From Swiss-Prot:
Its main location: cytoplasm. Keywords: Cytoplasm, Leucine-rich repeat, Repeat. InterPro entries: Leu-rich_rpt, LIP1_N, LRR_dom_sf. It comes from the Eukaryota. Residues 342-360 have a biased composition (Polar residues). Residues 464-475 have a biased composition (Pro residues). This is Serine/threonine-protein kinase 11-interacting protein. LRR repeats lie at residues 112-133, 135-155, 167-188, 190-211, 213-234, 237-258, 259-280, 284-305. It is found in: Cytoplasm. GO terms for biological process: protein localization. GO terms for cellular component: cytoplasm.
Length: 1137
């Protein structure tokens, strides 16, 4: 709650809205280009003040304050504020977490409201919605709604019955706790866009049918098991449907959406491609997402998917983000031909050929077999005809016409069988068999299997599954011709051959499984909800093998269903009343629990109907109990290894209770359906939360005390490590997001970098103020991985390809990019302000005024402060182990932002209560980009905070400058205050007194001692700068200077007599240069060989820069004065390595 008086708060708001230079300027708010965002305590103070100023209470329509002295500035600003609120079209209300939930907020001043967004504000706390609901066009509620009725029908805290919302076209109720829809949607006649994602909706019912104008519907991240029902008007207008992360096992219902263009079914329970048969009618489909479904991991996933799509959508369809290739379309057509060539079995055959996986059972629905093209009504001519008729037909068949018919028949044959038509040439050349033709005329056409009633023909058939999406038959009438007869003959031959092979293979597999049975068949009745699962044929044989539980057809001995016993999670024996031949009996009931993604397959009940049911149950239990104990033991061992978690906020380590371990418990199933036990801020995606603080930011636990990880280790590679960095260093461990299937494993091998198929996730902040997640991926297109450990070798600072902290070795320089581990640490441990958001960060050596030495620091910038986090050790493991918060300064106190000499550093100065800092970037491009991003962040602040900022993009040289004595040309013909040209570079230096005869020898002087401070980057360390010391290189037209500076800096407004902070380390005339050496493999390194004729000694300057362009720039600076001295070409020596 703000501590200011209501009047002062209103004055401050009015001043903010009146400043046109501010990002929240009044004109931008009024024209709708900006959204007015207010905290609920602030709005409460403002509305209560206005209520006091209206003695008779607020009325309807636009209002003005009662008459007051015209020269009263507070009253004028209050009137301005009231006018602004009455004309504001877009409002966003944010309810802070520390405020009580019983907190009334009135929006009566907003008379022209068109868009309203509520964040974390309970609807019952909102007043005044009934006066504006009829004109609202956009309504957004985030983490505050538990039912639609309390907002749409009751108008929040007004508790009044609402009429239709006439103008509302966009409704966003995502990230809430909605469990069901209700009839309040009937009031949204004009709704076009609806986002109900990230809720707990299990069923939509028929409530969405009233939305006849709906064009976009997002129901992702819910618990839907079926496609929602829509009205006829909606089916014609809907173009985008998002159903990702649900529990859909079928697409039935999508065939009624002919104009659908964008469809997202990712991460559902679609087990087979046949479930996509409803997509064949979506001719306008442009984008389809199916990743994460069980069939997504099949080898020919894209081709099998394409065969169920409309051919009209092939050219323009994006499947999982990429266009279908020509080969995939061709493979899809080939798969389609194979499906059409498979014969249709009779009802008797289909009843015994259930799916041999645990995905389907005999009583479950399955997709119908595709109809053959030849299944059509045959219209025959009369078998007895007049002689004159036949003679006339024969006379009307000239030779030319017969030849033409042969050609057409050949072309039709080639079109039917494609490139393989020559294999069936014998069928084309052979004469048609008259007996076969006659028999084919009298035989009925084949049809797809259909449900049969076993009571009518119990001896020949058993129940068969009903088709999932029945379609009305549309027979095509055509006259039988010899061409059609030939096609039918060839097709029937192929069908018989293919069907025979499949039947033989299936029979052999079933015989192998039955031969492994551990017990005799037991007669049981599968029960579902207290009733037989298949009332027409209730009993089956139950058999157990080493790996499967088999349900078999008692008539023909065929396998109807099989379940894998390694997923068995529970056994329960009880009794159930059963009616046998009119007598009520108590029979044993065996309940088995399995681990499955489909809820209906998690539990199966069998009533034992054997002659001796008790002994049969005992035999089954004796076989199943050892298997159950083995499964539970393996599960416990895997949980011990894989589920030890750590909270990034409170550092608590705990073991995560995996949902699948509780599948056998009905309470756990109900708890999974209702994950709101811990409030509105629950993660709806199923992630775990910390039991201590409730935080969702958890990771796999780090290394334990003996150096082992909590996950199984891969075997250490026997290949020698490939370390690209000079020097030793212990292997350190970091974790990142991986796409590999074995993502829970840990890599204990040192010096192992992530493979190309793996990725690290970064977070960045865009200019609009929204968090974006950027995946730097070189292998795959989707993020489906998990946390994973890997080891990297380093020295001093972790190589940039391990943690990706800018500036690094990535292709693009963007200080907004930050590793996801570091982003979590900064959000949890560093940022402490209200509504404070991360913006950018930079790893850079920093010099703080008053401290002698520079140190590695992570400079993190938020929308409120700048944090200087000292890097105290190797970058690995928990960021809290190698990051120490040093100092922080408010952005509102920043008074000076100056770029150092020749963009080698950046100076930040704060007011009298703050400090002064120098960022030694040693790179012009890094300094320029980071300065630009700081200025962008400062532009978000109100104008009064950055209007007094003193900024300079270049450091000027005056006679009082510290470098003036070195760069001033005393031999110049005229005195001038403008200095001559010079080159100034911050780099790392190492001297060699004796030059090795081999110019390619190592750059490191083994006799040199490691300096106390070495802030060289990993790239410079790799190229030999480990023993170098930081210096400043100054090159004039005659000399080269090596200067030691402490880089202490104070703003001009606080200039004092600073002690001498610079001394000359060495000076060499350019004429002493004997040669200059560049190395292609070390772009940051430069060797300058020197020879002093007076002292007759040789030496070398070994230089390392942080900018790969600087070595060549130094060479070009030395070229002109050296050639002017010796009048010969100055050619550097370039080495490969």
């Amino acid at each position: 709650m703000p501590s200011e008086a209501p009047e002062s708060l209103v004055q401050a708001l009015a001043q903010i809205l009146h400043e046109h230079d501010s990002l929240v300027a009044g004109d931008k708010v009024l024209d709708g280009s900006r959204i007015l965002t207010l905290l609920t305590p602030c709005l409460q103070v403002v509305t209560r003040l206005f209520e006091q100023l209206f003695p008779r209470g607020p009325g309807t329509g636009f209002q003005a304050l009662p008459a007051h002295p015209a020269d009263s500035v507070p009253i004028l600003r209050a009137q301005f504020m009231l006018d602004m609120l009455q004309k504001t079209p877009s409002l966003k209300l944010v309810h802070p977490a520390e405020c009580p939930r019983q907190f009334d907020v009135n929006i009566f001043p907003f008379k022209s409201l068109r868009s309203l967004e509520l964040r974390c504000l309970p609807p019952h706390c909102l007043r005044g919605l009934r006066s504006v609901y009829s004109q609202l066009e956009v309504l957004i509620c985030y983490r505050c709604v538990s039912s639609l009725e309390e907002v749409i029908s009751l108008c929040g805290g007004d508790l009044s019955s609402a009429l239709p919302w006439l103008e509302l076209h966009t409704l966003d109720f995502s990230y809430n706790t909605l469990k069901d829809l209700d009839s309040s949607l009937e009031l949204l006649n004009s709704l076009k866009i609806s986002d109900l994602s990230h809720n707990q909706i299990t069923e939509c019912g028929s409530y969405l049918k009233v939305l006849s104008e709906l064009q976009y519907l997002n129901l992702g991240y819910n618990y839907l098991t079926a496609v929602p029902e829509l009205s006829i008007g909606t089916t014609a207008k809907l173009h985008s449907l998002i159903l990702r992360h649900n529990q859909l096992s079928s697409t039935c219902g999508l065939e009624h959406l002919p104009n659908l263009q964008h469809l997202d079914l990712s991460y559902n329970l679609l087990l087979e491609h046949s479930k996509l048969s409803s997509l064949t009618r979506l001719h306008n489909l442009k984008q389809l997402f199916l990743e994460g479904n069980p069939f997504f991991f099949q080898k020919d996933y894209r081709a099998l998917t394409a065969q169920h799509l409309s051919p009209k959508a092939f050219d323009k369809l994006l499947l999982d983000g990429s266009l279908l290739s020509g080969s995939e379309i061709m493979n899809a057509q080939m798969f389609g031909e194979k499906v059409r060539l498979q014969p249709s079995s009779s009802a008797t055959e289909s009843s015994c050929t259930g799916d041999l996986t645990d995905s389907y059972s005999a009583a479950e629905k399955s997709a119908p077999r595709l109809l053959r093209k030849k299944s059509r009504v045959k219209v025959r001519t009369a078998s007895i005809s007049e002689r004159s008729d036949s003679e006339y037909e024969q006379r009307g068949q000239p030779v030319v016409l017969q030849h033409q018919r042969d050609i057409e028949r050949t072309d039709s044959f080639r079109e039917q069988f494609g490139v393989d038509w020559l294999q069936y040439r014998s069928h084309l050349e052979s004469e048609l068999d008259p007996d076969y033709v006659n028999s084919s005329h009298t035989s009925p056409p084949r049809a797809s299997p259909s449900p049969t009633n076993p009571n009518t023909d119990l001896k020949h058939t058993s129940p068969s599954p009903a088709p999932e999406c029945p379609r009305p038959p549309s027979p095509k009438t055509s006259v039988i011709t010899p061409d059609n007869e030939l096609m039918e003959k060839v097709e029937e031959g192929l069908e018989e051959h293919l069907w025979g092979l499949q039947e033989a293979k299936k029979t052999s597999e079933e015989e192998g499984l039955i031969g492994e049975a551990l017990c005799s068949p037991v007669v049981v009745c599968p029960v579902l909800n207290g009733q037989p699962r298949n009332p027409d044929w209730p009993w089956v044989f139950l058999r157990i093998t080493h790996h499967f539980l088999l349900e078999m057809d008692p008539e023909r001995g065929r396998i109807l269903l099989k379940r894998e016993l390694h997923s068995l999670r529970g056994i329960q024996k009880s009794s159930a009343p059963w009616n046998c031949n009119g007598e009520e009996q108590e029979l044993p009931l065996l309940t088995l629990s399995f681990e499955s993604v489909c809820e209906e397959k998690q539990t199966v009940n069998y009533v034992v109907l054997d002659n001796s049911p008790e002994s049969s149950v005992t035999i089954l239990l004796d076989l199943l109990h050892p298997m159950l104990e083995r499964n539970l033991r393996e599960k416990a061992e895997s949980q011990d290894d894989l589920t030890r978690m750590q909270c990034l906020k409170c550092k608590t380590e705990f073991r995560h209770e995996v949902d699948r371990g509780d599948i056998c418990n009905p309470e756990s199933i109900q708890q999974r359906k209702d994950p709101t036990a811990k409030g509105l801020h629950r993660n709806h995606t199923g992630d775990a939360s910390c039991p201590s603080c409730g935080s969702l930011h958890i990771i796999l636990a780090t290394l334990n005390s003996i150096g082992e990880v909590s996950t199984p280790l891969r075997p250490v590679s026997t290949e020698p490590p490939q370390d690209n960095y000079v020097g030793g260093g212990q292997a350190t461990t970091s974790f990142y997001l991986s796409d590999e299937e074995d993502s829970s494993e840990a890599d204990s091998s040192p010096n192992t970098a992530p493979s190309e198929a793996e990725r690290t996730v970064f977070y960045s902040f865009d200019t609009e103020g929204q968090d974006q997640q950027l995946a730097m991926d070189t292998g795959r297109s989707s993020l489906t991985g998990s946390y994973k450990y890997t080891a990297l070798s380093q020295s001093g600072i972790l190589p940039q390809d391990g943690w990706q902290i800018s500036p690094g070795t990535t292709q693009t320089l963007d200080f907004r990019l930050v590793d996801h581990r570091l982003k979590l640490y900064i959000d949890m441990e560093v940022l402490d302000g209200d509504m404070e958001e991360f913006r950018c960060c930079m790893k850079v050596p920093v010099v703080c005024f008053g401290k002698a030495l520079e140190f590695w620091a992570l400079v993190a910038v938020s929308n409120q402060k700048i944090y200087f986090l000292e890097i105290t050790g190797e970058i690995r493991g928990n960021p809290g182990d190698w990051l120490q918060p040093a100092e922080s300064q408010s952005l509102t106190l920043l008074t000076h932002l100056h770029v150092g000499l020749q963009e080698q550093s950046l100076h930040l100065g704060f007011d009298s209560c703050g400090g002064a800092y120098t960022l030694l970037t040693r790179n012009q491009h890094h300094c320029r980009v980071f300065t630009k991003q700081i200025l962008e962040i400062l532009s978000e602040l109100p104008a009064r905070y950055h209007s007094n900022l003193q900024q300079s993009s270049e450091e000027s040289i005056t006679p009082h400058h510290r470098l003036w004595p070195f760069i001033h040309d005393k031999l110049g013909m005229a005195e001038s205050n403008s200095p001559p040209e010079f080159l100034y570079v911050l780099l790392f230096f190492l001297r060699e007194d004796v030059v090795s005869p081999n110019a390619d020898s190592s750059c490191v002087n083994t006799d040199s001692q490691l300096p106390l401070v070495n802030t060289a980057s990993p790239a410079a360390l790799t190229q030999g700068a480990r023993a170098a010391s930081p210096v400043s290189l100054l090159i004039t037209r005659t000399h080269m200077y090596l200067l030691e500076e402490d880089h202490q800096w104070l703003p001009d407004t606080r200039t004092n007599e600073l002690p001498d902070n610079m001394q000359m380390k060495e000076k060499q005339p350019i004429s002493n240069i004997s040669s200059v050496h560049l190395i292609k493999s070390a772009s940051l390194h430069l060797r300058i060989h020197l020879y002093n004729e007076t002292q007759q000694n040789e030496s070398a300057w070994l230089l390392w820069t942080e900018d790969p362009e600087k070595p060549r720039e130094i060479v070009e600076w030395l070229r002109e004065p050296w050639e002017a001295e010796y009048h010969i070409h100055f050619n550097p020596v370039i080495h490969d390595t």
